């Protein structure tokens, strides 16, 4: 019954992702933004505490970082943009409003691909300031304002996801891209990358639902999947009973592995947005944008394409290698050193694919110096000198001890010979190339 219901219904998931930028100072003041693990309320000033008369001054570097992110997500960068006040009341928001962006964000209309062909549309990428942090101790709640005013980029996607697996892949790819740009460590556990999925259920090929549920308090990729899967199941069970889920904000309880009601979800008009009067609108010249674009490094998707085209390595291997920029850079440096040292001595194999295999399969650890890695790689790549007499003696023993396998091979089971190759390689302890073993075995078997 449940599978039939699922056949008729389809989850609709959009994402709001917040990225804390790794600038030295906060978004609108000169306080240090390096708040993690610091003494509470030690990185504050009248601006980030919202004291009367304090005026905000935008952080130029943070805006440049946002433009890099937007470019990496193939967004259109607007020529003009402005900041707005987003009003709501919460203890961690000292001003009673958050400086954010509403109707004129810095960038809009982007798109990225997950896997090879699934497109995810990016609605907007805009700038705002982070809030303080509430710390609950017993029957008291304390506030640490060190985080208040830290530059925060919000990335909003269209509701293009229908399952938690695609969400997880998208987030992992986004985290990798952010780290390549070197604008944030994008660490979910530290809170420098946060996810709020918006989930609803609609009939397949039907119109969008007239509600959506936002999930907060998700701080790892593992819990992303669990929170979304639980919420999809919860909403479907309600719909099966004829109940439309409430439009609300829910939290995720990691211990219970469940979502729970936090508050009724607000509409945009509830925030009473209006332009920030203390910050003039921004105008971005073509030269200014081009200078920022020129500073963007090669990103993972382009690196994957280059590895496949230039190094002739498999897509899956190229994808794995580019998940970590340090590993990817090490791979390229290792290729250069190994090829230089071999000096075309090894022509019969794809050296790049072999080195990729050494790294991915952890046959040679990348914790080694490049020199030591190169020495080990050359040893593995170089043809082995084979003692033919020793090899033939081992082959005779293997044939003698595996009469049934030999019989099967002679009856036409071609794969049987590979078992014999494996036995010979095992007994000779790797002192011969597999292709030499195969050749000598075929001679012996006739």
Can you say where each PLM-predicted feature lies in the sequence?
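Short, charge-rich amphipathic segments
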Residues: 1-6, 65, 95-116, 152-168
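N-terminal, positively charged regions that mediate nucleic acid binding
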Residues: 2-81, 86-88, 161, 172, ...
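Charged, compositionally biased, marginally structured helical/coil segments
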Residues: 5-15, 19, 35, 143-160, ...
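Short, well-ordered strand-loop elements centered on a beta-strand within folded domains, enriched
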Residues: 11, 26-28, 119-124, 209-215
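Short acidic, Gly/Pro-enriched loop/turn segments at secondary-structure junctions
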Residues: 23-31, 133-136, 205-208
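Aromatic-residue hotspot detector
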Residues: 28, 79-89, 93, 97, ...
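Glycine-rich, flexible beta-strand/loop modules in the N-terminal catalytic cores of phosphate-handling
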Residues: 39-44, 48-51, 119-121, 126-167
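SsDNA-processing nucleotidyl-transfer enzymes
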Residues: 68, 72, 77-148
């Amino acid at each position: 019954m449940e599978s039939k219901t699922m056949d008729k219904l389809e989850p609709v998931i959009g994402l709001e992702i917040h990225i804390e930028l790794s600038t030295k100072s906060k978004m609108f003041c000169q306080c240090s933004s390096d708040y993690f693990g610091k003494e509470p309320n030690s990185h504050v000033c009248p601006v980030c505490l919202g004291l009367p008369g304090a005026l905000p001054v935008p952080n130029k570097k943070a805006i440049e970082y946002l433009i890099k992110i937007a470019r990496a997500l193939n967004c259109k960068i607007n020529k003009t943009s402005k900041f707005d006040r987003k009003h709501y009341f919460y203890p961690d928001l000292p001003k009673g409003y958050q400086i954010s962006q509403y109707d004129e964000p810095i960038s809009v209309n982007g798109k990225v691909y997950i896997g090879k062909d699934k497109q995810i549309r990016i609605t907007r990428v805009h700038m705002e300031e982070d809030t303080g942090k509430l710390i609950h101790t017993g029957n008291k709640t304390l506030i640490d304002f060190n985080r208040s005013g830290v530059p925060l980029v919000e990335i909003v996607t269209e509701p293009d996801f229908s399952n938690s697996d695609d969400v997880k892949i998208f987030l992992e790819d986004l985290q990798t891209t952010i780290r390549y740009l070197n604008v944030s460590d994008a660490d979910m556990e530290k809170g420098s990358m946060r996810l709020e999925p918006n989930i609803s259920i609609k009939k397949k090929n039907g119109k969008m639902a007239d509600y959506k549920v936002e999930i907060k308090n998700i701080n790892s990729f593992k819990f992303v999947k669990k929170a979304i899967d639980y919420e999809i199941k919860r909403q479907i069970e309600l719909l099966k009973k004829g109940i439309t889920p409430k439009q609300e904000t829910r939290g995720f309880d990691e211990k219970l592995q469940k979502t729970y009601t936090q508050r009724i979800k607000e509409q945009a008009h509830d925030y009473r947005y209006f332009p920030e009067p203390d910050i003039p609108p921004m105008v971005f010249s073509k030269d200014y944008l081009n200078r920022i674009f020129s500073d963007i490094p090669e990103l993972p998707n382009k690196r994957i394409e280059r590895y496949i085209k230039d190094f002739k390595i498999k897509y899956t291997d190229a994808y794995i290698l580019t998940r970590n920029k340090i590993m990817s850079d090490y791979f390229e440096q290792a290729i250069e050193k190994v090829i230089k040292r071999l000096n075309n001595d090894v022509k019969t194999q794809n050296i790049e694919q072999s080195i990729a295999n050494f790294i991915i399969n952890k046959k040679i650890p990348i914790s080694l110096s490049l020199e030591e890695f190169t020495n080990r790689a050359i040893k593995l790549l170089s043809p082995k000198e084979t003692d033919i007499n020793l090899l033939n003696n081992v082959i005779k023993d293997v044939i003698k001890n595996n009469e049934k396998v030999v019989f099967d091979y002679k009856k036409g089971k071609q794969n049987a010979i590979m078992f014999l190759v494996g036995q010979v390689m095992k007994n000779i302890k790797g002192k011969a190339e597999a292709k030499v073993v195969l050749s000598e075995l075929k001679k012996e078997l006739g």
